[in-house]
Amino acid sequence: MLKIKNKKLQGFLLVLLGICIAIFAQVKLLESRHGDLTTYYEIRRWVQNTWDNTSPIPGVSLYIVAGIFFLLGLRSFVDTLPTLRIDNSYHPQTAQKFGFWATSLGISIIIALYANQAKGDDRDGYLFTIAWAVSIILLIASVCMMTNWRLPSRSTIFSWIKIHRAELFVLAAILVVAFIIRFLDIELHPYSFINDEGQMGSGGACIVQGKCLNFFSLGWADQPRLAFFPYAISIALFGRTALSVRLISVITGTLSVFAVYLFAREVFNKKIAWLSAFILSILPVHIHFSRTGVDNIIDSLTAPLILWLIFRGMKRNSTLCFAFAGIVTGLCIYTYPGSLLAAIFGVATLGYVALRTPGFLRAHARNILVFILAISVVVIPLLGYYSSDNEYFLGRWKRETILQNNGVPAQSRATGLSPSEILTVQFAKSSLVFISSDAPGNFFNSPNPYLPPVEAIIFMLGMIYVLWRIKDMRYTVVFVWFWAVVILGSTLTGGAPTSQRMLMSTPALSIIVALAMTGILDVFKQFHQPIARFSPIILLGLMLYFGYANISYYFYDYRIGHYYEDPTNELTYETRTYIAPLHSKGRMYLVGNPDEPYLTFESFNYFSPDVEKLTFNTVTKEAITRLPKDKDILFIALPDYKSNLELISQWVPGGEWNAFPRRYQPDDMLFYSYKLTKEQLAAFTH
């Protein structure tokens, strides 16, 4: 007994020492990142700059030391989480009932033949889309028939709700908070509405107008038309507004919080599930992209959803779960191109579990076949399109990765760094952004890392905790999940750290932080049992602190710092209130720098599609005389061209003059406007 106590005391002290060194490491990392990031990431000066702490080496080295002590301490304790049990029992096949397997697959192949020839505005597009949906429904029906699945009775449902009412209440509270955080003041934060959001909105509007009928073709940025369908529904309900576009991300981001809860609940326990969901709900980078009307946020939903369905299917030997996992995996090809990584990772996870688990293939052969069939039924139609335009398949990856298009050699020539040095810097930027480095540009442009200091320390300790349990398949999956995204989504692409491409890592990050919080408290409880009574208070305190730190940063510091603001995007957004009322009865003329293609920004067309928009760069009386006089005219002038607009107002007086300063930086003007009726314009004579 004394030996056991001494072992636990030694382990506890090592864990405490690891935590203390980790705190010191985080302080060192934060102190080292002052000044220009370009200088900070000059890899050949890292060793030289170690002594004055202007490189990441001191902080990272201390974290390694902290990890060693923390890991040595953990070895004196046991992991109290229940083991993951996979249903590996073999169920002999019963006589097969008639299903629609061949029908479902046949419909999918027919649609692929159509997609191979059809154009984006093909009038039969909706018909084939409905047929595709029918093929998926037939597949699900076949699985239900094969497994004799039935809906649970009403009494069973109510009984289940009664048993789990406390858990459901906490989950509902987290989801409500997540939605409110993402929906509050959605049209003005982040400010402003950017061009890519306008592109997504116009893609949805094209569907609403009946111009983009073929969902098995590509739209803007080589994204399948189906990716724009949710925006079409929102625009049909709420019109051409910023709300319509951003609401899709709000819903997707909230659902991703639910999905990470489901996955963590399935493979760990409800406490870790609650914590994971809450941590993801308040993570600034996740909040930001859940409020921005681009579809990058979908990655944080598809990844945990696929993994939840796969693990649920493996634990329960549920063919229906495997079918839905295959459907969601297949749908990834129809969304943001980065979601393909979620699909690949889901398939890889299934393969990994099969290799690690004796008898798995025999027990789950039918489930795996259904999984593959479900993927095939969903993806074959779009593959039909790619077969005729194969240069678009993985086109975004080919353009963005530094491994193609002479990316690494070009950087090597420009910087004088070797390929290994370039990749090291890319990896450092992509990983340190989570705990200590800025997140410049890439649709976020935050001066702070993704995690506040205390949460960053717990995350790093969580990474060590996961390594301690790496032989457990659950921990391996979470560990690889996080780092696969960091490497493939940012390290190997241009402009690291690419915040918009690392969103799939955020659910894994939240799980790692949750594992660290519960794991450290469990170590304390094993060392001194009375601590157990304080653990709920400690967890609640940490959650409240994280919530305050993250939410106050994103909704106050980040907002008043104007880090996301851009005059060009502000121009296209704020002028909508002047341009849109013209409808088809007016024209807009932009007076500005002729070298800047402002009117190519899709936001102009999204908010006011029926208004003719032109440039007016030669401001003379003769030019005004030549203007068509059949419509009202709105002149929009950039601040540097105010004098040109004043000339117009002098030559053609009586119009409506407006000055619009930047919304959150009112000392700077954004634009001036001058509106003339067609009668006023017709009365003008040179």
What is the predicted function of each stretch?
Residues C144-N148, I306-A323, C332:
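Membrane-interface transmembrane helices that cradle and orient dolichyl/undecaprenyl
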Residues F289-S290, L341, P453, I457-I458, ...:
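Hydrophobic/aromatic-rich transmembrane helices and adjacent perimembrane loops
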